[in-house]
Amino acid sequence: MAKKQFKAESKKLLDMMINSIYTHKEIFLREIISNASDAIDKLCYQSLTDENVGMARGDFKIRVIPDKEARTITVSDNGIGMTKEELDSNLGVIARSGSLKFKDDLGESAQEDAAIDIIGQFGVGFYSAFMVADKVTVITRAYGSDTAYQWVSAGADGYTITEAQKDTVGTDVIMHIKADETGEKYSTYLENWKLMMLIRKYSDYVRWPIVMDVEQSDWVDSGEKDENGEPKMEMVTKTEEQTVNSMIPIWQRSRKEATDEECIAFYKEKFHDNDDPLAVIRVNAEGLISYRALLFVPSKVPANMYTRDADPGLELYSSGVMIMDRCTDLLPPCYAFARGVVDSPDLSLNISREMLQHDRQLKLIAANLGKKIKSELTKLMTNDREKYEQFHAAFGMVLRAGAVTETGDKVDEIKDLLLYHTSETKLVSLKEYVDAMPAEQAKIYFACGDNVKRLLSLPQAEQLRDKGFDVLCMTSQIDEYFVDTMKSYDDKPFCNIATDDLGLESEEEKKETEAKQAEDKELLDFVKETLGEQVASVRLSNKLVSSAVCLSTEGGVTLEMERYFRSMPGAPTDIRAVRVLELNANHHAYQTMKEAFAAGDKDKAARIAKILHAQALLIAGEPLEDPAAYSELVCTLI
């Protein structure tokens, strides 16, 4: 038969199909197996109404056969096969999907039948074979026909169709693998282990058995005796047909069919984790987009979680065929710790089936999965506080980062999952903190730093403790940005005890402080002059009880923010907090400095001012520029 040309933009278009659409050559096997699965689906559907098919569901299978000597890989199915006309139209016209046409012809009611789950949409997957093969031969016999046909093509030069011999209904796709090139070892695809790996990676959950002949070696009794009279064993290697894929994914099973123990075993094997997950989340959604998901909350942080090598995201499947192994769009950033799989027959894939065409579908799934994860974590917090605190210790940073990057109702969703120390041992949520607030407490007090013990001992916290008000210790660098995003919780404003007015003074007390400030103005100006640019201003404090001094800030940049920017390589060096030195007018150190200044001993007053400033820096967790000078100052006053 004369060679035919492809009925499309011919050579140019086929070249694009082969070289431009797919990013990974190894997916050729996924595409050919998916076509075989579709062919079996069609004949299985036919068998529901045609008893002449003569095949039970358990008879269908897909066979993968490598031949190193011939350098071929054959994918054989016993599906519906193709007529000569179908060969010409389906394989001769690029981007025509016979599977999609079949699905359209069924009508909506038939598509809902659980036996039908057509994968193919675009009619280009077959041509991915040319990424690894320099020639492809298709031998097929259609159901209801006694004649088989052979389709042969070496790529863009066209194809031929001739009659062939085939005893059974179905299709054999024979790929003649290319010779090895520099940087591309095509021979690897002829190895059993490589083909099995690709099947398990991309087609593990295709509903039909994918079988291969696998060599198995074992010690058997040879029937002879050794010198000790014991049975003599010999190694025997035999070839057995082995089903490579799992077929029915665990997430497609009901709770009765798949226990939590089985799901946990799946998690450990799938994600290479020796520890049980903290939570198993199952989702079965139907509506605008139907999908199933099986999610897990790990019990510990992956080694690369907070590095640039982190690989968050869920595995994405379309009708059991893996599309992406790390789809980050399926999870809101705050839930990036979750592992698992999502499978949907309704995804609008692009032509290579390597990504989605409409992110609206992903956003819908991600929003729903976010709600499910939030619900599960809330339940865990309520029912198993110890386990939840274990989760929070591992992944609290992820929640906080998500709270900062998300906007609007996402912040409201995340805020109730966060925990903060109010003592060295006690953790509370924002809701628990507000519920426990005394009636006279109007603000949510918090302090930021890297150490709970230091934050609890801040001088600014003493007055609050005396009144029975707890302080939230925020030890993550992200916490301050999170609070700044929220502004308030349950109509209670946040108050940073290092920067904000605590709001505890009465009008009479405020006037008293202002009067003292005016009275000691000359001394306070002297302290400011002594310290120079190290502080922006000096004032008497309304926050201190027994402590002599504290360091506060004004404006939008706090000490924690300054430290954060200081730790970033290449960050601007001019981002600095506006420092304010606050002094306790009732403390004996202040009184001693005041007496020295009044007596004209400005050297002593200056030394005390410098020591107080150094103490304020140390209390705030700031380094001293000259520790030796500080030590010398202390010694002069002893």
Stretches with model-predicted labels:
Residues M1-Y189, M197, V220-D221, P438:
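GHKL (Bergerat-fold) ATPase N-terminal catalytic module, capturing the glycine-rich phosphate-binding loop
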Residues I118, V136-G158, K178-I638:
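GHKL/Bergerat-fold ATPase module in large chromosome/replication-associated machines
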